[in-house]
């Protein structure tokens, strides 16, 4: 099945096949979700079979909305599909645009709606092995430090979010000094 995502072509938002959007480096819509339990954030290591950035750590989940799908609905859908997480309320936190080389001749040029969801620390997580290699909870401050010390272990977008948009995503109380 071909997955069509919203992308800008010659200034118009239109459906484009997902891989083509990355091959051409087209500006396209995306979502990212951070599930938090207090100061801890749930992160995932991307499955080895992913077509870009396999084996790298990322935020809780991220994807592209389908053509015609609302970003908030997409966030809830991908929490369920990637991690088996249901019942959380996702709250819009920020919109970020970035462009990054993700290897293999692919470019992520995304306009990302970022959502945050609060969860209990005993949240059941059931990752889809086609999407997720492993998950872990990590204190947000420790994660920011890890990303600075070992950027090669993390996806470009997570590095960008934590380096450039921390306060806008997580609020003043969670900003690492």
UniProtKB/Swiss-Prot annotation:
One BP term from GO: chlorophyll biosynthetic process
Catalysed reaction per UniProt?
A: isopentenyl diphosphate = dimethylallyl diphosphate
Q: Which GO terms describe its cellular component?
A: cytoplasm
The record's keywords, sorted A to Z, are: Chlorophyll biosynthesis, Cytoplasm, Isomerase, Isoprene biosynthesis, Magnesium, Manganese, Metal-binding, Photosynthesis
The lineage's top-level taxon is: Bacteria
**GO molecular function annotations of the record:** isopentenyl-diphosphate delta-isomerase activity; metal ion binding
Task: Note whether Transport occurs among the keywords.
Answer: no
Q: Where in this chain does the record put each Nudix hydrolase domain?
A: 26-160
Entry binding sites for Mg(2+): 82
**Cofactor, free-text remark:** Binds 1 Mg(2+) ion per subunit. The magnesium ion binds only when substrate is bound. Binds 1 Mn(2+) ion per subunit.
Q: Which CDD domains match?
A: NUDIX_IPP_Isomerase (cd02885)
Q: Where does Mn(2+) bind?
A: 22, 28, 64, 108, 110
Q: What is its EC number?
A: 5.3.3.2
Which pathway does this chain act in? Isoprenoid biosynthesis; dimethylallyl diphosphate biosynthesis; dimethylallyl diphosphate from isopentenyl diphosphate: step 1/1; Porphyrin-containing compound metabolism; chlorophyll biosynthesis
Main EC class the enzyme belongs to: isomerase
Keyword field contains Zinc:
no
Cofactor(s) needed for function? Mg(2+); Mn(2+)
Q: Which subcellular locations apply to this protein?
A: Cytoplasm
Annotated active site residues, numbered on this chain, are: 62, 110
Matching entries from PROSITE patterns are given as: NUDIX (PS51462)
In the record, the note on similarity to other proteins reads:
Belongs to the IPP isomerase type 1 family.
In UniProt terms, what function does this protein have?
A: Catalyzes the 1,3-allylic rearrangement of the homoallylic substrate isopentenyl (IPP) to its highly electrophilic allylic isomer, dimethylallyl diphosphate (DMAPP).
Entry's NCBIfam families?
IPP_isom_1, PRK03759.1
Record-linked PANTHER family: ISOPENTENYL-DIPHOSPHATE DELTA-ISOMERASE (PTHR10885:SF0)
**Name of the protein this chain belongs to:** Isopentenyl-diphosphate Delta-isomerase
Gene that this sequence comes from? idi
């Amino acid at each position: 099945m071909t997955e069509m995502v919203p992308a800008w072509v010659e200034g118009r938002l239109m459906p484009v096949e997902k891989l083509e959007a990355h091959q051409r480096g087209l500006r396209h819509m995306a979502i990212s979700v951070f599930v938090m339990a207090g100061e801890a954030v749930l992160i995932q290591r991307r499955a080895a079979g992913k077509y870009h950035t396999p084996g790298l750590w990322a935020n809780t989940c991220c994807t592209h909305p389908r053509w015609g799908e609302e970003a908030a609905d997409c966030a809830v859908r991908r929490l369920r599909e990637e991690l088996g997480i249901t019942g959380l309320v996702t709250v819009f936190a920020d919109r970020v645009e970035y462009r990054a080389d993700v290897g293999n001749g692919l470019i992520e040029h995304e306009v990302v709606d970022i959502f945050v969801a609060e969860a209990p620390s005993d949240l059941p997580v059931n990752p889809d092995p086609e999407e997720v290699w492993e998950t872990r909870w990590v204190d947000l401050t420790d994660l920011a430090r890890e990303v600075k010390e070992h950027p090669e272990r993390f996806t470009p977008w997570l590095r960008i979010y934590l380096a450039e948009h921390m306060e806008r995503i997580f609020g003043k109380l969670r900003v690492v000094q």
